A protein has these predicted regions:
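Positively charged n-region of N-terminal signal peptides that target proteins for export
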Residues: 1-6
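Cleavable N-terminal signal peptides
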Residues: 10, 21-24
């Protein structure tokens, strides 16, 4: 239908120079634009280009209502510049966004990386950001960390934006866990979505609960809902028969999602979602470009900027992650190695790679664990690994593993040795299913050392 309407509109223009197909003209018109992203993790190379992109989008769409929605995990404790500066760049980014458009942030598990949760919310509000979070309370006061929802004016239309976050305390900074009271997101949604999303013409959900929880929440939302997910560091879009548009925007601000509000021939609203790459090398906002350079100069040490390797070409994060998994397999004497995708942040640049760039790619360190598994089960584990943006929604269960080493030709009854990180071993059911595997810590192999050793032997 939409292709026909577009053809009708263009044909009318060719014949008369003006539209004689009002339904087609209405269907082509963008009623509002939303720039949506999550899991930013203090990706400072992308900060200035993001604000420049907002300026470009607004200039290219004059008069079109525009807003920015951020779906949690904007901060990154592992970024030494962010930690030492107490996120001054992140807060400047939010101030710049809020100055340009209404900006709403749904809390994730990394917002308390530098401050206690209440202080983090106050810092965000102070720079003009509207903060929401439905299922999180301050255990000391019993009060919500933020309202569950907010209204967003989009020209003549009003959207209701509802926020929900993960209840996995282990993903929060250790120091803030005792003060958090987190309701199960699915239970909370069942109790609160009906009232919050009732009688709203434009329902929007920002979920930082992950795909596993989202799968149970998606049937609870009205037809036509725009449902943004985050937490799993994945990127895809999916449209349900009900018109619900579900998507994740990736991580490290490598992409953003652009949601366009349109009308169908009957006058009902629907959303189109386009995922757009954000080029870190593109010209950025001058003020933020200068700020990033200045703050880095103030807080980086010679150890941070030491060169730890060199690459003939840039490596996207998936390629860098598979190289790391292959390094672990070799170091641990395993047939196949699996590393959870959220272990990795951004990719690696061409040329000299510094310690801080390496740490931004391989976010965590720790011991490697090994286990044995039969070939039939290993075949299933490999099939669930290395998911890209084109993987069908039916295969998505949340976080996944990057796998390397032997990836095929498994004999069903043969026993194979596999390796993973300490995080994978501790969360074996999540990554490797049931029955739980019996993991043993390798006596010497550590993740980052294994990757650096492989790097020095053969450039990836």
């Amino acid at each position: 239908v939409r292709i026909f309407l577009r053809a009708c509109f263009l044909f009318a223009l060719l014949l008369t120079g003006e539209s004689s197909c009002p339904a087609a003209e209405a269907a082509l018109r963008t009623e509002a634009l939303l720039l949506i992203l999550g899991d930013q993790h203090s990706a400072y190379d992308q900060v200035a280009p993001l604000v420049a992109e907002v300026d470009r989008l607004k200039a290219a769409n004059p008069g079109v209502p525009f807003a920015v929605l951020i779906d949690g995990d904007s901060f990154e404790y592992g970024n030494v510049v962010a930690r030492r500066s107490e996120a001054v760049i992140d807060l400047a980014l939010f101030a710049a966004l809020a100055k340009r458009a209404p900006t709403i942030l749904n809390l994730g598990n990394h917002e308390p990386d530098f401050y206690d949760p209440a202080a983090a919310v106050a810092k965000l509000r102070a720079v003009g950001v509207v903060v929401i979070s439905g299922n999180a309370r301050d255990r000391n006061t019993g009060q919500p960390l933020a309202p569950a929802s907010t209204l967003l004016r989009l020209g003549a239309h009003t959207a209701t934006v509802v926020g929900v976050m993960t209840d996995q305390l282990s993903t929060f900074r250790l120091a803030v866990r005792p003060g958090l009271d987190l309701a199960n997101p699915v239970v909370w949604a069942k109790e609160n979505f009906p009232a919050l999303l009732k009688d709203t013409g434009l329902p929007i959900v920002l979920s930082h609960a992950g795909i596993r929880a989202d799968r149970e929440m998606l049937p609870l939302v009205p037809a036509g809902t725009l449902f943004a997910g985050a937490h799993d560091h994945v990127r895809f879009t999916h449209r349900f028969e009900t018109g619900v548009r579900y998507f994740h925007s990736g991580s490290w601000m490598e992409f953003y999602s652009l949601a366009k509000l349109r009308r169908d021939p009957g006058g009902s609203f629907y959303w189109e979602v386009e995922q757009v790459p954000l080029d870190a090398q593109a010209p950025g906002d001058p003020a933020l470009t200068a700020l990033v350079g200045r703050v880095r100069a103030e807080h980086l040490t010679p150890k941070d900027t030491a060169v730890v390797g060199r690459l003939p070409r840039a490596l996207p994060v998936a390629e860098a992650a598979r190289f790391a998994a292959a390094a672990v397999a070799r170091a641990a004497g395993a047939d196949t190695a699996f590393i959870g995708n959220t272990t990795f942040g951004g990719g690696l640049p061409a040329g000299n790679v510094t310690q801080i760039e390496f740490d931004a790619c391989v976010r965590f360190d720790g011991p490697i664990f090994t286990a044995t598994v039969r070939g039939a089960r290993l075949r299933e584990l490999v099939a669930a690994a290395n998911l890209g943006p084109e993987a069908p929604f039916e295969r998505r269960r949340g976080e996944f593993s990057f796998a390397a080493g032997q990836l095929e030709n498994f004999a069903d009854e043969k026993t194979y040795r596999i390796a993973t990180t300490d995080w994978g071993a501790k969360n074996t059911a999540r990554y490797f299913g049931e029955p739980a595997l019996a993991w043993q810590e390798h006596p010497t192999v550590k993740l980052k050392a294994a990757v650096r050793a492989a790097w020095s032997e053969a450039r990836p």
